[in-house]
Amino acid sequence: MSKSHAAYIDYALRRTTNMPVEMMGSDVVRLKDYQHFVARVFLGLDSMHSLLLFHETGVGKTMTTVYILKHLKDIYTNWAIILLVKKALIEDPWINTILRYAPEITKDCIFINYDDQNFRNKFFTNIKTINSKSRICVIIDECHNFISKSLIKEDGKIRPTRSVYNFLSKTIALKNHKMICLSATPIVNSVQEFTMLVNLLRPGSLQHQSLFENKRLVDEKELVSKLGGLCSYIVNNEFSIFDDVEGSASFAKKTVLMRYVNMSKKQEEIYQKAKLAEIKTGISSFRILRRMATTFTFDSFPERQNRDPGEYAQEIATLYNDFKNSLRDREFSKSALDTFKKGELLGGDAIAADISLFTELKEKSVKFIDVCLGILASHGKCLVFEPFVNQSGIEILLLYFKVFGISNIEFSSRTKDTRIKAVAEFNQESNTNGECIKTCVFSSSGGEGISFFSINDIFILDMTWNEASLRQIVGRAIRLNSHVLTPPERRYVNVHFIMARLSNGMPTVDEDLFEIIQNKSKEFVQLFRVFKHTSLEWIHANEKDFSPIDNESGWKTLVSRAIDLSSKKNITNKLIEGTNIWYSNSNRLISINRGFKGVDGRVYDVDGNYLHDMPDNPVIKIHDGKLIYIF
C-alpha cells in the first residue's frame, strides 16, 4: 500500500509549494531540504495527526519541530502547544530555539517535565485550562523516555505516566489534534517499546501479537504495508555504535577503540567481594556493585546489608575523605605530565614521588588512570562518560583530574544550576582546542539533548544496558557541523570503550554488558528497518507509480487498518548448504560473531538472518586460531 501513501505525500507537497524555507525571529535560519520536506508533508496533510521524527542526533529535529509549530496557524487559527520534555532540556534547546526563531508562539506553549513526580496531575490540570475551540499540538521530546515511563511494571503496577499515554492515544486523532514524537533512539530496552510507540502514533493498529519468532520478524511486509507514513527517518549512520564510520563534509570521522585494562590486585579483591555481596542481597542482575568496583575501589569494601543507612553513608564519607586527604598537596611534576602528553609511561629514571603517586592511583582505579593518560595525550577536547556520580564515580574522578592537572567541567545531577553555562563556555570558539577547558565529564544527565563541539576523544567508563544509550552518548559529539571550527586534520572523534579485565581470564561485568547489548541489537535492527521503509522519505523516493489525488479524505482509513501477524506468512524454513564462519564488522575485531556462508555466497548471522553477499575478495584476519571475515 506504499503507493497509496506516496499519493498523499505528493498531495501534501503540492499544497505547500509556497511554504518558506527560512525561519525568521530574532535570527534567521535556512532549513535543510530534509527538514523542509517533513514539515511540508506534516502540515500539508491536516489529517496526519501524528508523526515520529526518527532523526539521528545532531541533524536538527528540534529546529524542524519549531518550524512546524511556527506554521501551525497556516492550517488552523487557535492552537495550544504542549511540550513534554525532560527538565534538563526545557531551557536549552527548546525555549532558546523558540525565542530565537519563533517567539510569536511562546504565548501558546506549555512546558511540562515528564520527569516530575507530579507530571500526571500537571498534565491534566493544563488540559482542563485549554479553550475548547483550540486544537492541541503535543510534542514529546526523547519519546523513548516517555514510552519507558509508561510501561507497566513487572509487578503489574501501572505508572502515573501511563494515564497520559492512554489519553493521548485516544484523543489526538479523535479530536483532530496533532502530535510529534522525537527520538534518535525510539527503541531502547525491549520490543514492547516498539508496540507502545506504534499504538501511540496509530492507536489500536498493533494489538497483542508476537512480533518475533526465533528472533526474526514474523511478517515485516505486513508491518511496512500498514504503517506507511509512520515516521520521518533521517539516519545517516546505520552502522553499529561499535563500527568505524568515515567522515563527510558535515560529520566527523568516528573511530572505535576498545581499551582493555587489567584490574589491580586490590581491585580484583574488592570486585570479588562486590560480586558476593550482590548475590547475598539479590541484586546480582543489576551488577551495580561490580560495575562500581571495576571503576574505583577504596581500601576496603563497605558492606551495606543489614546496616543502618546513616552508618553506611558515614563509612563511605570517611573512606572518601581519607582518599581525598591522601592526595592533599600532591600532583605530578611537569616532567611527568610532559611524558604523559607524549603518550608514554614513566620510566625508571622518573622522580620517585611521581612513580609512587602513579602506583597508588593505579591500584585503586586502572580505568581512571587510563582515562587521564588518554586525555593528556589527546590533541583536542575530550568527553568522559561516567554514570555514577558519588562514591566511586565522578566525585572521585575529579580528584584524579586535579592530580593530573586536567581542566574540566561537570554535567551531572550535582551541577543543575551551573551546567548549561559551563557547556556554553566549553563550546566557545576560543576553546576549540581545549586551551581553557580540556574535558567535560558527564553522567546520564548529559546523555541526551545537549551538543558538544570540536570533540576529538570520548571515553566511556561504564557500559550501558543498550546500544541506544551509547548512541546518544556518542551523538553528543558527532553532530551536523560539530567540527566546522576544528582544523581539517582533527575532524575526527575517537570513541574509547574502557573495559576492565580479570587476571584469570573470566569475563567481567563490562564484557557481560557488551554481550547483552549485542544480543538486543539483533531484534532492534529489524524494527529499525521497518521504521526506515515506512518513512515519508523512503516512500517518496521509491514509490513513483501512483495516481495523484486532490483531497485527503481517505488518509484516516488508510492509516487506521489493523495489523494482522497471525498468518506468519513470511516464515519459511529452508535447509541451506554451506559452512560455518566467523566474522567481524571491525578491522580491529572489536566483536567477533558466528555466522554461516551458503554455497551461493550469501552470508547469514547465527539466527539465520541474511546479512549480505560474500565479497569476491574478502578481507580475512587470523585471531586465536580462527579465520575472521571482515565485513
From Swiss-Prot:
Transmembrane segments: none
Sorted UniProt keywords: ATP-binding, DNA-binding, Hydrolase, Late protein, Nucleotide-binding, Transcription, Virion
InterPro entries recorded: Helicase_ATP-bd, Helicase_C-like, NPHI_C, P-loop_NTPase, SNF2_N
Residues that coordinate or bind ATP: 55-62
GO BP annotations listed: DNA-templated transcription
Domain of life where this protein originates: Viruses
Domain Helicase ATP-binding: 42-204
Predominant localisation class: virion
Subunit record text: Interacts with the late transcription elongation factor VLTF-4/OPG110. Interacts with the late transcription factors VLTF-1.
Protein name per the record: Nucleoside triphosphatase I
Gene source species: Monkeypox virus
